[in-house]
C-alpha cells in the first residue's frame, strides 16, 4: 500500500538543521509516513543526523530533483552526459545514506 507523504517545502523552504527538524517533527505529528526533500547537498546537511532522525520517527524518505542543462543525460555531448551521470550517482548515494529507496 502506498504511504501518504508530504514535501518538506510545505513546512520550510530551507535546509538548516532547525528547519529540517521542524519539517520532520510536523510531518510525523500530523501522521505522514513519508517526507520528500528536494536534493540536499551532503556538504551542507548532516546526513548521518538526518538519517537517524528519519529512522527514529519511523518515516520513509524520498528525494526529488531535476538535472541542470549541463547535466542533461540525453545530450549528444559526452561530457554533459558524464556530468549528469555523476550528479545522479551522488543523488542515489544520498538517498541510500538517508535510508530511502525513492529518487
PLM regions: where:
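N-terminal pre-domain/capping segments
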Residues: 1-100
Amino acid at each position: 500500500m502506498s504511504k501518504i507523504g508530504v514535501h518538506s517545502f510545505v513546512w520550510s523552504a530551507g535546509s538548516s538543521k532547525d528547519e529540517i527538524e521542524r519539517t520532520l517533527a510536523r510531518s510525523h505529528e500530523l501522521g505522514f509516513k513519508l517526507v520528500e526533500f528536494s536534493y540536499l547537498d551532503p556538504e551542507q546537511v548532516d546526513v548521518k543526523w538526518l538519517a537517524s532522525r528519519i529512522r527514529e520517527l519511523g518515516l520513509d524518505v524520498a528525494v526529488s530533483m531535476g538535472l541542470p542543462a549541463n547535466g542533461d543525460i540525453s545530450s549528444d555531448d559526452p561530457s554533459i552526459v558524464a556530468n549528469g551521470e555523476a550528479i545522479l550517482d551522488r543523488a542515489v548515494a544520498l538517498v541510500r545514506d538517508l535510508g530511502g529507496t525513492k529518487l
